[in-house]
């Protein structure tokens, strides 16, 4: 059984000498971490399905890379117990050690003896049950620095849309798509096991293989559009999330308190599902029958399609004139849509104008 150990050293490098309530005191964070990061949901088994790095060594060793397994367990104090299993030169190798938690949720520190390097790692985005993206800033005592991004999955694959968002984040970090290493699914290896390489076959043979069960999505959900997984009961109540990318894209989110679709700035990748291109898409995804009890509140607007609003007093769906919009989510884009949500139209009302 081949086994190596990653040993943490005191935080004497880079001026990281202090502690705060047992946590390492590090420089100001380089990246924002996942909002409301929940460590108890994050621990468990992950697979590194894709990565990129500015480190030349990483790029030189990209051929035929196999997906590895990372198991995280909460240890005593402010530490994470880490067990990593991966294929290395035809042999399954297991490495174990500890990561230091920091005072910033989602930020982790560890030291690599082999490279004499400190690693400052940030969980920039995760939905816990499916994928996680981590950015790592590595600094050696020699002064050499590098940045790596890793895409982890609870299974051996990720949806195409998640991989696309990972690629977008890589570009925002100044690296190109051709630096991304998409790892191969060769199954979970067993420490000490010798792997018989079979280049002519899609996957190598093994004397025995232990495959972990899927923990989250079924196989048919391994790819496809995010809309197929849209959960309005959760998504429409979520706060708007910019995501880890640095773009400035105008989007709309549903404010479940005011029952309005409101503007926010989207970074361009990841974030959550409360993110829509148009007000119409936002309303049609998120509004409920409760909007039928909202008052009619016409207001002037430009460049918007003709809408209908439900008059709760008369029980009618009322058309608005061109150039008039509704100030809340009691707005529909056809009489049929209004009737479907709010009931039978008793009588057509007069065209309304803003007061």
From Swiss-Prot:
<keyword id="KW-0722">Serine protease inhibitor</keyword>
<dbReference type="InterPro" id="IPR029856">
    <property type="entry name" value="AMBP"/>
</dbReference>
<feature type="binding site" description="covalent">
    <location>
        <position position="55"/>
    </location>
    <ligand>
        <name>3-hydroxy-L-kynurenine</name>
    </ligand>
</feature>
<dbReference type="Pfam" id="PF00014">
    <property type="entry name" value="Kunitz_BPTI"/>
</dbReference>
<dbReference type="InterPro" id="IPR002223">
    <property type="entry name" value="Kunitz_BPTI"/>
</dbReference>
<dbReference type="InterPro" id="IPR002968">
    <property type="entry name" value="A1-microglobln"/>
</dbReference>
<feature type="disulfide bond">
    <location>
        <begin position="301"/>
        <end position="325"/>
    </location>
</feature>
<keyword id="KW-0165">Cleavage on pair of basic residues</keyword>
<feature type="disulfide bond">
    <location>
        <begin position="317"/>
        <end position="338"/>
    </location>
</feature>
<feature type="domain" description="BPTI/Kunitz inhibitor 1">
    <location>
        <begin position="236"/>
        <end position="286"/>
    </location>
</feature>
<keyword id="KW-0325">Glycoprotein</keyword>
<feature type="binding site" description="covalent">
    <location>
        <position position="138"/>
    </location>
    <ligand>
        <name>3-hydroxy-L-kynurenine</name>
    </ligand>
</feature>
<protein>
    <recommendedName>
        <fullName>Protein AMBP</fullName>
    </recommendedName>
</protein>
<dbReference type="InterPro" id="IPR000566">
    <property type="entry name" value="Lipocln_cytosolic_FA-bd_dom"/>
</dbReference>
<comment type="similarity">
    <text>In the N-terminal section; belongs to the calycin superfamily. Lipocalin family.</text>
</comment>
<keyword id="KW-0157">Chromophore</keyword>
<keyword id="KW-0964">Secreted</keyword>
<feature type="binding site" description="covalent">
    <location>
        <position position="150"/>
    </location>
    <ligand>
        <name>3-hydroxy-L-kynurenine</name>
    </ligand>
</feature>
<dbReference type="Pfam" id="PF00061">
    <property type="entry name" value="Lipocalin"/>
</dbReference>
<keyword id="KW-0646">Protease inhibitor</keyword>
<comment type="subunit">
    <text>I-alpha-I plasma protease inhibitors are assembled from one or two heavy chains (H1, H2 or H3) and one light chain, bikunin. Inter-alpha-inhibitor (I-alpha-I) is composed of H1, H2 and bikunin, inter-alpha-like inhibitor (I-alpha-LI) of H2 and bikunin, and pre-alpha-inhibitor (P-alpha-I) of H3 and bikunin.</text>
</comment>
<keyword id="KW-0677">Repeat</keyword>
<dbReference type="InterPro" id="IPR036880">
    <property type="entry name" value="Kunitz_BPTI_sf"/>
</dbReference>
<dbReference type="InterPro" id="IPR012674">
    <property type="entry name" value="Calycin"/>
</dbReference>
<feature type="disulfide bond">
    <location>
        <begin position="92"/>
        <end position="189"/>
    </location>
</feature>
<feature type="disulfide bond">
    <location>
        <begin position="292"/>
        <end position="342"/>
    </location>
</feature>
<dbReference type="InterPro" id="IPR020901">
    <property type="entry name" value="Prtase_inh_Kunz-CS"/>
</dbReference>
<feature type="disulfide bond">
    <location>
        <begin position="261"/>
        <end position="282"/>
    </location>
</feature>
<dbReference type="GO" id="GO:0005576">
    <property type="term" value="C:extracellular region"/>
</dbReference>
<feature type="glycosylation site" description="N-linked (GlcNAc...) asparagine">
    <location>
        <position position="231"/>
    </location>
</feature>
<keyword id="KW-0732">Signal</keyword>
<feature type="domain" description="BPTI/Kunitz inhibitor 2">
    <location>
        <begin position="292"/>
        <end position="342"/>
    </location>
</feature>
<feature type="glycosylation site" description="N-linked (GlcNAc...) asparagine">
    <location>
        <position position="255"/>
    </location>
</feature>
<keyword id="KW-1015">Disulfide bond</keyword>
<feature type="disulfide bond">
    <location>
        <begin position="236"/>
        <end position="286"/>
    </location>
</feature>
<feature type="disulfide bond">
    <location>
        <begin position="245"/>
        <end position="269"/>
    </location>
</feature>
<dbReference type="GO" id="GO:0004867">
    <property type="term" value="F:serine-type endopeptidase inhibitor activity"/>
</dbReference>
<feature type="glycosylation site" description="N-linked (GlcNAc...) asparagine">
    <location>
        <position position="145"/>
    </location>
</feature>
């Amino acid at each position: 059984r081949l086994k190596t150990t990653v040993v943490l050293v005191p935080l004497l490098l880079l001026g990281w000498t202090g502690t705060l309530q047992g946590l390492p005191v590090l420089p100001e964070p380089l990246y924002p971490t996942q909002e409301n990061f929940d460590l108890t949901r994050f621990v468990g088994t992950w697979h590194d399905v894709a990565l990129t790095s500015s480190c030349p060594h990483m790029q030189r060793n990209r051929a035929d890379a196999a997906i590895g397994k990372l198991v995280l367990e909460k240890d005593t104090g402010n530490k994470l117990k880490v067990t990593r299993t991966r294929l290395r030169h035809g042999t399954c190798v297991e490495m174990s050690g500890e990561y230091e938690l920091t005072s910033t949720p989602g930020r982790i520190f560890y030291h690599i003896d082999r490279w004499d390097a400190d690693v400052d790692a940030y969980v920039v985005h995760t939905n816990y049950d499916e994928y996680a993206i981590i950015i790592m800033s590595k600094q050696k005592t020699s002064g050499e620095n590098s940045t790596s991004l890793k895409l982890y999955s609870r299974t051996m694959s990720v949806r195409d849309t998640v991989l696309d968002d990972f690629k977008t984040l890589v570009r925002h970090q100044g690296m190109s798509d051709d630096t991304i290493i998409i790892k191969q699914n060769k199954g979970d290896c067993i420490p000490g096991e010798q792997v018989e390489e079979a280049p002519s076959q899609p996957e190598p043979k093994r004397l025995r293989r232990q495959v972990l069960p899927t923990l989250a999505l079924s196989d048919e959900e391994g790819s496809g559009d995010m809309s197929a997984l849209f959960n309005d009961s959760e998504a429409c109540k979520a706060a708007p999330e910019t995501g880890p990318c640095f773009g400035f894209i105008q989007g709309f989110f549903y404010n479940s308190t005011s029952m309005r679709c409101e503007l926010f700035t989207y970074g361009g990748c990841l974030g959550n599902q409360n993110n829509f291109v148009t007000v119409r898409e936002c309303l049609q995804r998120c509004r409920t029958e409760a909007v039928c009890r909202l008052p009619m509140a016409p207001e002037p607007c430009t460049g918007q399609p003709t809408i209908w609003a439900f008059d709760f007093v008369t029980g009618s769906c009322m058309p608005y004139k061109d150039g008039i919009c509704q100030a809340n989510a009691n707005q529909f884009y056809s009489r049929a849509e209004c009737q479907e949500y709010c009931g039978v139209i008793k009588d057509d009302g007069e065209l309304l104008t803003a007061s």
